[in-house]
Swiss-Prot record:
It comes from the Bacteria. It catalyses: Mur2Ac(oyl-L-Ala-gamma-D-Glu-L-Lys-D-Ala-D-Ala)-di-trans,octa-cis-undecaprenyl diphosphate + UDP-N-acetyl-alpha-D-glucosamine = beta-D-GlcNAc-(1->4)-Mur2Ac(oyl-L-Ala-gamma-D-Glu-L-Lys-D-Ala-D-Ala)-di-trans,octa-cis-undecaprenyl diphosphate + UDP + H(+). This is UDP-N-acetylglucosamine--N-acetylmuramyl-(pentapeptide) pyrophosphoryl-undecaprenol N-acetylglucosamine transferase. UDP-N-acetyl-alpha-D-glucosamine binds at T10, G11, G12, N126, S200, I255, Q300. Pathway: Cell wall biogenesis; peptidoglycan biosynthesis. Its EC number is 2.4.1.227. Cell wall formation. Catalyzes the transfer of a GlcNAc subunit on undecaprenyl-pyrophosphoryl-MurNAc-pentapeptide (lipid intermediate I) to form undecaprenyl-pyrophosphoryl-MurNAc-(pentapeptide)GlcNAc (lipid intermediate II). It is a peripheral membrane protein. The lineage of its organism: Bacteria, Bacillati, Bacillota, Bacilli, Lactobacillales. Belongs to the glycosyltransferase 28 family. MurG subfamily.
């Protein structure tokens, strides 16, 4: 099966595609030369995709400027130019199906494919539908989604298929070869442990609250792994020069093998991006979510509230974050085993362990 995947800008648009590609190859459905990822040169995909050995092409496009509407004339012009580039790629590659995950590049690629009567589908990872996917919902053959709230935003009900996030299945496979990373970090594998992180680059608000809470956390009968993010690591280390923050806290720039570490955690403190949530629910890890307020349509807050409603997460809005509610939330999970187990079961109930296979099934059904 020849497939064009398209999406970009953020990891939430890229990682589901990478998970599907991995599964297509594992099952022998598509060889490497039958798979193409179309993104932009400036997006995160331009680094991640080629590094994974996946064929990659780019088209030039930009998003709408909400602060300066007059600049959107250029955006519209670029969109129509991008559809011409998309048509050329489609004619040359001759895909059996085109799948988009969001981002403006997917808008051009999937729209043009639909106009050419090539089978098309989209996948929405968040609880709030992005602009590109909302637009494409009218034209595609199928709409795959993760959160029920997202499904409500699409009027095309017959096209909807609940598949979950493909990253769920991938992360389950990645952690099968268990290694005890806590032991490698000099921690006690028998003690309750919380992982605190804000993504690969880190999150300023999470790092700030950790700095304010360290003296209280060092007294606790549990362990903390704090991944500051590569961007903030040096500044955090500088602020902690000469500070005794205890033996129960390990500070790292980032976690290299996150899928291997997550199953060992009693609890995780994190942002609430779609990819992270897919990982947590696949593994049934209780989470304290601090949604980023700096995202389109506040979708991280809505993602987080969906988990909290299901009993799988505690949510602390960034504006409400203080050392008292931060530490007490961690205590609530790590010092109450019954509550932690209930959260874990609620989280697992939301996960879809065969999400990639479910998306591939839809691809096979509509492919020409």
């Amino acid at each position: 099966m020849r497939v064009i995947f398209t999406g970009g800008g953020t990891g939430g648009h890229i990682y589901p595609i990478m998970a599907i590609i991995e599964r297509l190859k594992e099952r022998g459905i598509s060889k490497n030369d039958e798979i193409l990822f179309v993104g932009t040169q400036k997006g995160l995909e331009s680094k991640i995709v080629p590094a994974a050995g996946v064929n990659f092409e780019t088209i030039q496009i930009q998003g709408f400027n909400r602060k300066h509407p007059l600049k959107n004339f250029e955006t519209i012009k670029l969109f129509f130019q991008a559809t011409k580039s998309a048509r050329k790629i489609l004619q040359e590659f001759k895909p059996d199906v085109v799948l988009g995950t969001g981002g403006y590049v997917s808008g051009a690629m999937v729209y043009e494919a639909a106009k050419m009567h090539i089978p098309t589908m989209i996948h929405e990872s968040n609880s709030v539908v992005g602009l590109a996917n909302k637009f494409l919902g009218h034209y595609v053959d199928k709409i795959c989604y993760t959160f029920d709230d997202a499904a409500k935003e699409f009027p095309e009900k017959k096209k909807l298929v609940k598949t979950g996030n493909p990253r769920s299945q991938q992360v389950l496979g990645l952690h099968e070869d268990k290694v005890n990373l806590q032991k490698e970090l000099g921690l006690n594998p028998q003690m309750p442990t919380v992982l605190v992180f804000g993504g690969s680059r880190g999150a300023l608000a999470i790092n700030r609250i950790m700095l304010k809470s360290l003296m209280e956390l060092k007294k606790k009968p549990y362990q903390i792994i704090w991944a500051t993010g590569t961007y903030y690591f040096d500044s955090v280390q500088k602020k902690l020069e000469g500070v005794d923050y205890g033996d129960n806290i390990k500070i790292l720039p980032y976690i290299q093998n996150m899928p291997a570490l997550l199953p060992e955690m009693t609890c995780v403190v994190s942002r609430s991006g779609a990819t992270s949530i897919a990982e947590f629910t696949a593994l049934g890890v209780p989470v304290i979510l601090i949604p980023s307020p700096n995202v389109t349509h506040n979708h991280q807050m809505k993602n987080a509230l969906d988990l909290q409603k299901a009993g799988a997460a505690l949510v602390i809005p960034e504006d409400d974050l203080n050392p008292n509610n931060f530490v007490s939330s961690i205590d609530h999970i790590l010092l109450d085993e019954k509550y932690a187990n209930e959260m874990s079961e609620a989280s697992k109930a939301l996960g879809v362990p065969d999400a990639s296979d479910q998306v591939i099934k839809v691809m096979e059904e509509i492919s020409r």
